[in-house]
Amino acid sequence: MKYIPSIGLEIHSELSTKSKIFCDCPVSFGGEPNTRCCPVCTGMPGTLPVLNKQAVEYTVIAGLALNCKINEFSKMDRKNYFYPDLPKAYQISQFDLPICKDGGLTINTPDGEKFIRIERIHLEEDAGKLLHDNYDRYSLADYNRCGVPLIEIVTKPDLSSAEEAKEFVEKVRLMLLYSGVSDCRMEEGSLRADVNVSIRPIGTDELGTRTEMKNINSIKAIARAIDYEINRQSELLNEGKKIIQETRRWDDSKGESKALRSKEDAHDYRYFPEPDIVPVTFKSEDIEKLRKSLPELPDKRFERYTKTYSVNQADANLLLTSVSLSDFFEAAAAESGNPKQAANFIVVEVLRRLKDSNMSPEDIPFDGKLLARLLRLMDSEKITPNNAKKVLSEMFETGKEPDTIVDERGYKIINDTAEVESMVKEIISSNEKAVGEYLEGKEKTFGYLMGQCSRALAGRGNPKVVQEILRSELNKLRDIDINVH
């Protein structure tokens, strides 16, 4: 029997505030265990939380970026459960009145555009981290992450495949990055996702029993986990077995999931309003002020790149994968006056060097304006495209200005036609066999002769000029040959 998957996501994103959500402990990745926590974030008796205003504003900004409505009245709640990484035995979160609700994003699918609804975005504190791997009989708790402000983005079960989920998570990641509320470093755990999967037979509308897989921290792993769970549930139903509502742990190294516990419902957590924090209220003018502070988001940039700059869609998407790369392109495009050329050069040459050097766009040792100067040197035919690539490599190694490298390396194009003509004649006289084949009609030998000329001129000959002079000299020989016969 064939089944239709229904997939919902709970995307957790740590906010890029300087301090934690209820205390002034710093928010930063790593550090010695239990050195970035205090009595407040570890829940010591007698301590009181103070809500971080910036965390609240970042939640609103994230909601606006994801097309949500903002509740002018919301509150914090206690979510009660026991786990060693939660020292208070409850998490301060939001239950029935989240800050953001009713949003969504449009993604591209093979069948066209599809709108994925976001049910809510709520603000909460992150838990600590348990370390299991190197210990046989016990686990260690690191509370550095305790109290880091976190938003949870909860979708409706609108996704139908692993590919759609990948597309959606990547788009959310970009929205959060460009809006400046999170660094979204999945490898550091600042962006992770829980995946809810159910399947139902084709022709039925009632959703099946769902399972949840927790804390998946890469987009590829999210896709693998979804595919695995769809196959697992399909096999169970085909064997006449029931699917149990449960929470499962995804092991990406083994490519499988294992049952952790039965899936909890909201009443299991015994939510009640947090008595130590006043409700969060907004005026409409506060929300509008934050809306106006939003930078240009990826969808708008994509539209401008493709329509105004005539950049093809594939290149535009590549340029938008990083805020730093997009800003680098913006600077190069503005300075060079030729956005399409700048986009092509960045996508082909700059990205190749980043990949070869295992660097990220943030590591580029020069700005977009310097790249534009290199492009202008090439446009004005002061250097050849080949030498432009050499200059780019040296810019990556040294950070020097392109004009300096051109002068130091002697890369300037030879514009003296007499010098080029003299060199071409030498090449013709020293390559009698190739010249003879060309005169006999073997056009491909012309490319060989062009290569010889380029080497003789150390790559500094203007290709158009060299080609014209070489053809002219060869045609003279052909005319002589015709006249002789």
From Swiss-Prot:
UniProt catalytic activity: L-glutamyl-tRNA(Gln) + L-glutamine + ATP + H2O = L-glutaminyl-tRNA(Gln) + L-glutamate + ADP + phosphate + H(+); L-aspartyl-tRNA(Asn) + L-glutamine + ATP + H2O = L-asparaginyl-tRNA(Asn) + L-glutamate + ADP + phosphate + 2 H(+)
Origin superkingdom: Bacteria
Gene Ontology annotations of biological process type: translation
Pfam family, one: GatB_Yqey
PROSITE patterns, per database record: GATB
Keywords: ATP-binding, Ligase, Nucleotide-binding, Protein biosynthesis
Enzyme Commission (EC) number: 6.3.5.-
GO molecular function, one term: ATP binding
Keyword Protein biosynthesis: yes
Keyword ATP-binding carried by entry: yes
Gene3D superfamilies linked to this entry: 1.10.10.410, GatB domain, N-terminal subdomain
Function: Allows the formation of correctly charged Asn-tRNA(Asn) or Gln-tRNA(Gln) through the transamidation of misacylated Asp-tRNA(Asn) or Glu-tRNA(Gln) in organisms which lack either or both of asparaginyl-tRNA or glutaminyl-tRNA synthetases. The reaction takes place in the presence of glutamine and ATP through an activated phospho-Asp-tRNA(Asn) or phospho-Glu-tRNA(Gln).
PANTHER family attached to this UniProt entry: ASPARTYL_GLUTAMYL-TRNA(GLN) AMIDOTRANSFERASE SUBUNIT B_E CATALYTIC DOMAIN-CONTAINING PROTEIN, GLUTAMYL-TRNA GLN AMIDOTRANSFERASE SUBUNIT B MITOCHONDRIAL AND PROKARYOTIC PET112-RELATED
Quaternary structure, from the entry: Heterotrimer of A, B and C subunits.
Family per record: Belongs to the GatB/GatE family. GatB subfamily.
Annotated HAMAP family: GatB
Protein name, entry field: Aspartyl/glutamyl-tRNA(Asn/Gln) amidotransferase subunit B
